[in-house]
Amino acid sequence: MTGTVKFFNESKGFGFITNEETGQDIFVHVSALNGVELRDGDKVEYVEEEGRKGKVAGQVQVID
C-alpha cells in the first residue's frame, strides 16, 4: 500500500500515515521503520497489519 506521512513524532516514536486509496489514517510505530527516518509529507510504501487496536503500518519504506 502507499500513503503520505501525516505526522510522525520522533520523541514519542509514533505517528500516522494517510492511505492514498482510502484517505484513512493508519497508525505507525517506530518499530515498523527498520531504521527509516520519517518526515511529515513523505510518500511511503507499507504493509497493512492487524495490531492490538486495529490496523497498523508495517515494513515502512520511503519512496520518491
Predicted regions and their residues:
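Long, polar low-complexity intrinsically disordered regions
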Residues: M1, R39, V62-D64
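Structural detector for short beta-strands of small beta-barrel domains
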Residues: M1-F7
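Short aromatic-glycine-enriched beta-strand elements
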Residues: K12-I17
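Short nucleic-acid-contacting surface segments enriched for D/E, G, S/T with interspersed K/R
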Residues: L33-E45
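OB-fold/S1-family single-stranded nucleic acid-binding modules
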Residues: E49-D64
